[in-house]
């Protein structure tokens, strides 16, 4: 998509202001995330698709600049965790509108990305976005992650599993860790998170065969909202997850794991 191109969103045409595009590029540069002109164009077009989509509520804002600078940029921040840049197979758990999976697919064209989303209308949007952007090497799985993680095609198959705005850390651990190969990483994208949630997440990870590897602060330039705290919580899988996990659909959220199992 050439700069300035608009995407129609019903009665109104959407476009991203030049100032927002430039701030987006500067933040990527500050993070050391390389993006070609074509990749930047695809990321902008994706933001416009999110802002303009009307068939389902896939995102909470209709402002293209907000979508680009908060949601798409937030997704790209996962690449501050450098091992992710070399991941060959990535799962986006609870993908929603494709965040962070679609931006990461654009920035990591060689990676195989699987978007796991249980809501049918959101899965429809994901397929629409993939087709509209001309992406390959990215698939949509319309199912609960608790079921997906028990399938041989997905269990212990991923180098990385990502989750953004899905659930508390102990719940995310049970969703993500069973998908990982030993040595793989779960990346939980968090804003403000109380210390007790981190400790509970660490205990849940241990039950699942993983450990808390680190917490990365996400620095932001003033023009993209430096006051908005973001953190990446990293779990590393050290051994195979016991076969009883994840538990049946809905149970991880209702009864989150604790360190005792």
UniProtKB/Swiss-Prot annotation:
Location (main, coarse): cytoplasm
First-tier enzyme category under EC: transferase
Binding site for S-adenosyl-L-methionine: 94, 99, 117-119, 145-146, 164
Any GO CC annotation of this UniProt entry: cytosol
NCBIfam families from the UniProt entry: rsmG_gidB
Enzyme Commission no: 2.1.1.-
Gene3D superfamilies associated with the record: Vaccinia Virus protein VP39 (3.40.50.150)
Organism phylogeny: Bacteria, Bacillati, Actinomycetota, Rubrobacteria, Rubrobacterales
Family membership noted in the UniProt record: Belongs to the methyltransferase superfamily. RNA methyltransferase RsmG family.
Organism superkingdom: Bacteria
Location in or out of the cell: Cytoplasm
Cited function: Specifically methylates the N7 position of a guanine in 16S rRNA.
InterPro entries: rRNA_ssu_MeTfrase_G, SAM-dependent_MTases_sf
Keywords associated with the record: Cytoplasm, Methyltransferase, rRNA processing, S-adenosyl-L-methionine, Transferase
Name listed for the protein in its UniProt record: Ribosomal RNA small subunit methyltransferase G
Pfam family, one: GidB
GO MF annotations, alphabetized: rRNA (guanine-N7-)-methyltransferase activity
């Amino acid at each position: 998509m050439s700069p300035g191109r608009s995407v129609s969103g019903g009665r109104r045409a959407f476009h991203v202001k030049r100032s927002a595009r430039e701030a987006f590029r500067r933040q990527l540069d500050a993070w050391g995330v390389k993006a070609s002109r074509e990749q930047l164009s695809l990321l902008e077009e994706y933001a416009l698709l999110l802002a303009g989509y009307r068939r389902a509520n896939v995102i909470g804002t209709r402002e293209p600049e907000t979508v680009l600078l908060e949601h798409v940029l937030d997704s790209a921040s996962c690449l501050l965790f450098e091992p992710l840049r070399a991941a060959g197979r990535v799962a986006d758990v609870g993908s929603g509108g494709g965040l962070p999976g679609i931006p990461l697919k654009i920035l990591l064209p060689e990676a195989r990305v699987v978007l796991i989303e249980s809501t049918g209308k959101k899965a429809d949007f994901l397929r629409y976005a993939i087709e509209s952007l001309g992406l390959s090497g990215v698939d949509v799985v319309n199912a609960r992650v608790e079921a997906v993680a028990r399938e041989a095609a997905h269990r212990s198959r991923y180098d990385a599993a990502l989750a953004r705005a899905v659930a508390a850390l102990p719940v995310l651990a049970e969703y993500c860790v069973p998908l990982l190969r030993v040595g793989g990483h779960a990346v939980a994208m968090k804003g403000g998170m109380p210390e007790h949630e981190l400790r509970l997440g660490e205990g849940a990870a241990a039950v699942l065969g993983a450990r808390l590897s680190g917490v990365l602060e996400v620095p932001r330039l003033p023009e993209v909202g430096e006051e908005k705290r973001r953190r990446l919580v990293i779990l590393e899988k050290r051994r195979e997850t016991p076969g009883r996990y994840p538990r049946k659909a809905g149970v991880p959220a209702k009864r989150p794991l604790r360190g005792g199992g």
